[in-house]
């Protein structure tokens, strides 16, 4: 699963991406060795089951800090988007190509209203940031509709083409965007389309695309620059749009992570506050800057919002849960004796069989049954996983 960071120029998109991917929690032996220039690794933060079990864990694919698991996830930094991107304006084509790979989107909005629709600086509060949400949605839908409409008249007028065959055609055309057949079926129902596909108008298909965009590219709004005075009222207006909205100060998060990197403060992404290290020698400017972050961001908002955006994208938009596969269900270890070695993200509603196949194809294909490591109960391959499950898979040798 990958999440795309999107937004117009100067909204703080690059700052958000830099803050989210500046590692302050060391992860040893993580399998990614190279990341493309516009790719980065960030981390989900979730309560680890080690405290509940009263054990000292030894994570391999993630890190546990004071009972909090930090699980690596991949972010895509999409180029800044301006109106007309769907027709190739600006870096539109590159943006849309990157977007194909994203399963969900975090839309960075300049909540202060100090940049116009193309990202050019303006007076604070002069621009309505709600308009930025609408233009991005329209560009995405225009792009999807272009793909769908290619030769549509010819295809839809094909002798005897049924709505069921139209579903197959649409799903195949949009498969590169991550669109699934069931999503097309749902979108057609929501749009109220029945009968002959040849009778569906461009407006009809436009309604279908609107529902498909929400399903295939779910989006949350990061209302950035929350520390600026003109942002407060705008955040309320943005929230009334109906989208999942998180108040954010990407600049504050980046400053805090850089301070950690320099050994000046103790801070974990998502914390409500920081503490200055006893050995740190802060300049008056550094001390004033940190206090400003505390006063204008952390105290009123409870956090910078960056970590909440990452968590919400995966846990709310993509409906992911965390499970802990182990080899020894009695000691909660892998074959090397590491306690709770892996925290794996998987879709809510996934079965034990799907988890086994995810771990290794051979394990899934040879699976006999599973074991609930919390109580020793035997589990069938159709067992539906819950967040926090600790499970062992038994397979034929």
Regions found by a protein language model. Give the residues of each.
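C-terminal-of-GTPase-core extension/linker across diverse P-loop GTPases
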Residues: 1-6, 11, 17, 152-389, ...
């Amino acid at each position: 699963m990958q999440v795309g960071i999107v937004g117009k120029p100067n909204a703080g998109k690059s700052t958000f991406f830099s803050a989210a991917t500046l590692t302050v929690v060391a992860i040893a032996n993580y399998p990614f060795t190279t990341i493309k220039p516009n790719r980065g690794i960030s981390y989900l933060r979730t309560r680890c089951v080690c405290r509940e079990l009263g054990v000292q864990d030894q994570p391999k694919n993630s890190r546990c800090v004071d009972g909090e698991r930090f699980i690596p996830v991949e972010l895509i930094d999409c180029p800044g988007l301006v109106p007309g991107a769907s027709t190739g304006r600006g870096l539109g084509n590159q943006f849309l190509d990157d977007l194909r790979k994203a399963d969900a989107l975090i839309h960075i909005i300049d909540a202060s209203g100090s940049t116009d629709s193309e990202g050019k600086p303006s007076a604070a509060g002069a621009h309505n940031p709600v308009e930025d949400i609408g233009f991005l949605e329209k560009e995405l839908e225009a792009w999807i509709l272009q793909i769908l409409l290619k030769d549509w008249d010819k295809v839809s007028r094909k002798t005897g083409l049924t709505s069921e065959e139209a579903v197959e055609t649409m799903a195949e055309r949009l498969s590169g965007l991550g669109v699934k057949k069931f999503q097309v079926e749902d979108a057609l129902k929501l749009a109220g389309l029945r009968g002959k596909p040849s009778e569906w108008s461009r407006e009809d298909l436009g309604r279908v695309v609107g529902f498909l965009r929400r399903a295939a590219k779910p989006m949350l709004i990061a209302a950035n620059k929350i520390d600026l005075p003109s942002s407060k009222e705008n955040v309320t207006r943005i929230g009334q749009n109906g989208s999942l909205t998180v108040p954010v100060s990407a600049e504050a998060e980046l400053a805090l992570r850089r301070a950690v990197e320099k050994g000046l403060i103790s801070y974990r992404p998502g914390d409500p506050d920081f503490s200055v290290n006893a050995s740190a020698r802060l300049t008056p400017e550094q001390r004033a800057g940190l206090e400003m972050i505390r006063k204008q961001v952390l105290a009123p908002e409870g956090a910078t919002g960056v970590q909440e955006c990452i968590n919400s994208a995966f846990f709310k938009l993509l409906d992911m849960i965390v499970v802990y596969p182990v080899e020894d269900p009695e000691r909660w270890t892998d074959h090397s004796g590491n306690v709770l070695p892996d925290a794996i993200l998987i879709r809510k509603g996934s079965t034990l069989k799907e988890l086994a196949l995810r771990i290794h194809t051979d394990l899934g294909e040879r699976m006999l049954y599973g074991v609930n490591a919390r109580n020793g109960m035997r589990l069938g391959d159709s067992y539906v996983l819950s967040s926090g499950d600790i499970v062992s898979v038994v397979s034929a040798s």
